[in-house]
Amino acid sequence: MAAGAVTSTAPAREKPRLTFWQIWNMSFGFLGIQFGFALQNGNMSRIFETMGAKTDDIAILWLAAPTTGLLVQPIVGYFSDRTWSPRWGRRRPFFLVGAICASLALLVVPNVSALWMAAGMLWIMDSSINISMEPFRALVGDLLPAEQHTAGFGAQTFFIGIGAVIGSLLPPIYTKWLHVSNVAPAGQISPSLKYAFYTGALIYFLAVLWTVVTTREYPPANLEEFKAEKRLHSGFWYGIRESFAGVVHMPRTMRQLAVVQFFSWLALFSMWIYATPAITSHIYHTTDTTSKAYNDGADWVNVCFAVYNGVSALAALGLPIIARATSRRFTHMLCLVSGGIGLISIYFIGYIPAEQTVSLHLFGSYTFRVIELVLLIPMLGIGIAWSSILSVPYAMLAGALPSNRMGYYMGVFNFFIVLPQMVAGVTLGFFTKHLFNGASIFTLVLGGVSMILAGLITLWVNDDDDVQMMPGGEPTENFGYGTPATRA
């Protein structure tokens, strides 16, 4: 615990088990949040290139995302821990403010007319998404008893997957099914991408609003003590100092998971930044942003992202089974290695003959290149890794944190999501230009190596809250179901 914190003397409230629909409602906002992230992650590099950015400059432009995360997430976590309104609760005001700002940003982004405007809007959009997203993690610890933590994080992972699938598919849906053009003159965003962002803005706001309206939060266990701590330690600069001081006072499990997170998110960020330039150049053999081939390739990147997010949602159902039979550490390692192999394999897919096509009938007749369909195979491994990244580290972490500092430490933990992204933003452009001679496909390979390394490091994490699961018994915490048995 960071210095200066008031230690609670009130007995911990015994939280009632929530019903399926209560967990559903409290997690539903993640559906909308992921629409925003899906559109951002799948299309900002495309927008940057359309506005004239060079491939090796894209990474530095993406610095907006991790920088805002570094500043916003721990501060929002800190102040949401110290917020209480009888009407609005603790986390819900942040959900609503972030949703309003993010939805407005999604409306503006596809109408930018210059590179600096696109970069600036990424700052605003990512900050807003972080404001509404960060307290959702803490809400699980606030409302759910320990034995339902995994169910809570699993529900969030499910909505993250579903939201990302539909959000990622919005541009190709408008292009393929609704026949909106995906090509525009130089320096302009295509109509199909504009409509995708407009749709995402509406869904983002409505989904988060649903959680705000349907979820009720518990007041602090000792309201007078809570008010005393708030008066003592509620200053803005105190909050910033406490947030960043949390890195020094992290529990052991949190420190170890931080290393795993670093290499995991370095890999993910390399994919989000360079998937569009890598696939359009290595698979579609073009860098002309006004060409149909480039925009078809950029649309297919969204399809790839939809597939890995769909796999993530399904994998979330199977991860507890694997963890029950083995351990959370082994499960996370296995998933990360699968994702790393998937990223590396994209390089080899580029050598499949590009002329072969196949016709599929799905809400109409469509012709695809075989290489496009094969490109979906690596997304299976990436989706499995993504599912684990979104749930297993948080399930491991929740048991190692004091309940009255849950939002605070969840915010601090996000440092190790944004720090590797900042490292990627500063270094990947240099590597792409000078090490890989501008071939961004090798940046994806580097990301795959980083993800495999993260998986291997997971085996050294102390997960004292995890237990071996035996068949049968009541639902328990620790990522599975069954009667706990002592681990040797």
Describe the predicted segments one by one:
Residues 1-21, 113-120, 129-132, 136, ...:
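Intracellular loop-helix junctions on the cytosolic face of multi-pass helical membrane proteins
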Residues 8-68, 256-260, 264-288:
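Helix-loop boundary and gating motifs at the non-cytosolic
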Residues 54-64, 191-192, 285-310, 373-377:
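Loop-to-transmembrane helix entry
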Residues 55-56, 146-156, 298, 401-413:
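Loop-to-transmembrane helix entry/capping segments in MFS-fold secondary transporters
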Residues 73-88, 314-328, 432:
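Helix-to-loop junctions at the C-terminal end of transmembrane segments
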Residues 95-114, 338-368:
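C-terminal ends and interior cores of transmembrane alpha-helices
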Residues 131-144, 388-402:
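Intracellular juxtamembrane helix-capping segments at the cytosolic ends
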Residues 403-434:
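A late C-terminal transmembrane helix in Major Facilitator Superfamily
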